[in-house]
């Protein structure tokens, strides 16, 4: 069976990693400012979409400006600011994409393909980020990046045959992705692909989605090939906000772990993913520590009872 993943040379991968390593990280103030500018851009784009639906045709720039109560100069300025801010936030967080993609390096997808998928997730995270909620962007973006990568892995093997005209469009998309990646020194965003291909952004995203192919959830992934894909996929009920709250819990727990017994520390670390980033089930923790599932449950309860008594900081988590 052929694969849709491109074959990338080690030199290309190395050049990409060197290129993104030169990008300066954003300060907290820049993150806040850029986040607000992107929010404004997304509001303007939403208004344009609503206007298009209402009018039944593509609105003129004048109609768009009037709908958002701006003159043409201010509309252009805010669009340009938002696009620049979005680009800056993406470029400054590409190292985060790489660090997450490394966790999923295996035979099913090329490393740069994983990075490409993660970059698309990062782009969505930038678009959805609300700086007023006080989240650190990298924590919020982690959820979007990991979701994009794991879903791409889950859809890697095709179960249906696509029409030839769709396949041709997907091949053109893939070629453009590779060319842009080489020109930019990084993965191309959906917006950049849409501009080069002269296609609507949503259509490009639809083609990207079509280009992903499903595999069995029983497939083994990870460095040691001992983890099933279904263990890596996000809970459908989870959300970026849930993930940020879980990260806050992890941080608070680390500050109190010293008060627990070594065995309690091990249970809490594995259950909440304090060391490896992924939470394990009671059964998996039991296997790691060579103790029963019920013993794990008891140790976790004892540890959480102690932590609850010791700090009001955990009250909202322990109550949930």
From Swiss-Prot:
GO biological process, one term: DNA-templated transcription initiation
Positions of region (Sigma-70 factor domain-3): 168-243
Keyword Transcription: yes
Motif stretch (Interaction with polymerase core subunit RpoC): 113-116
Keyword terms of this UniProt record: Cytoplasm, DNA-binding, Sigma factor, Transcription, Transcription regulation
CDD domains named among the record's database cross-references: Sigma70_r4
Positions of the UniProt region annotated as Sigma-70 factor domain-2: 89-159
Protein's recorded name: RNA polymerase sigma factor SigA2
Annotated Pfam families: Sigma70_r1_2, Sigma70_r2, Sigma70_r3, Sigma70_r4
Cellular localization per UniProt: Cytoplasm
Record's keyword annotation contains Transcription: yes
GO molecular function: DNA binding; sigma factor activity
InterPro entries: RNA_pol_sigma-70_dom (IPR014284), RNA_pol_sigma70 (IPR000943), RNA_pol_sigma70_r1_2 (IPR009042), RNA_pol_sigma70_r2 (IPR007627), RNA_pol_sigma70_r3 (IPR007624), RNA_pol_sigma70_r4 (IPR007630), RNA_pol_sigma_r2 (IPR013325), RNA_pol_sigma_r3/r4-like (IPR013324)
GO CC term, one of those recorded: cytoplasm
Family: Belongs to the sigma-70 factor family.
Its biological purpose: Sigma factors are initiation factors that promote the attachment of RNA polymerase to specific initiation sites and are then released. This sigma factor is a component of the biological clock pathway that affects the circadian expression of a subset of genes in this bacterium.
DNA-binding region: 282-301
Gene name of this polypeptide: sigA2
Region (Sigma-70 factor domain-4): 256-310
